[in-house]
Amino acid sequence: MQKVLRFRNGAKEDSGDLALLLDVAGRGLPAYLWSIEAKQGQSAYEYGREKIRSDENRRSYYKNWYVAEKNGILVGAFFGFIVETPYPEIDYNDIPKYLHPIVELEKVASGSWLLQAISILPEYRGYGFAIQLLRKVEKVVKALGLKSISLQVEEVNNSALGIYKKNGFEEIDRRTYIPFPGSRDTGDFILMMKNLK
């Protein structure tokens, strides 16, 4: 298998794959949130796909993604954003409890480029593609003139945690995971950061 990936900007036609990759990266939380927002009779996946396809105000809008391809086939993708400084005041009564630790860690990451989602389709894992995606992330962030990349990872996601550590990310902070309905994960959310040279 050829191991060199080609990167491009996300396209509207990628929206179905991007919805899947976002949900995989978020360990089911995106689909749960979509299920709350979806209309009666609308599937969560259909709703998420449509939001990625058409809602320019969402961070997960398809134009904000970078897509990795092998021989013209989408194998993975990522997106992120600059965390505001100063971080806006949040009324925690306005957001569900299970999002509190995520928002708290995002606040700690103020000023960095937060890698919101990065994922590879299951059939393309184990070929070293994650490292190529992370290298592309660094190029994107450096081109913006920023000096640090942050990300959040669940403590139970051992494979991702290992890849991030191996690629120079260090733990900065953590918060106790609060499960959303249907989640079986436990432990902590970990905020990791990599300073760029």
Where are these regions (language model features)?
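A short helix-loop-beta-strand connector motif used in the catalytic cores of GNAT acetyltransferases and
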Residues: 52-67, 84-88, 114
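Conserved acyl-donor/pantetheine-binding loop and adjacent beta-alpha core of acyl/acetyltransferases
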Residues: 82-117
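A short beta-loop-alpha structural element at the N-terminal edge
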Residues: 6-21, 27-33
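Conserved GNAT acetyl-CoA-binding A-motif
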Residues: 111-113, 125, 134, 141-152
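Conserved acetyl-CoA-binding loop-helix of GNAT-fold acetyltransferases
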Residues: 120, 126-139, 143, 162-166
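Conserved GNAT-fold acetyl-CoA-binding loop/helix
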Residues: 27-53, 64, 88
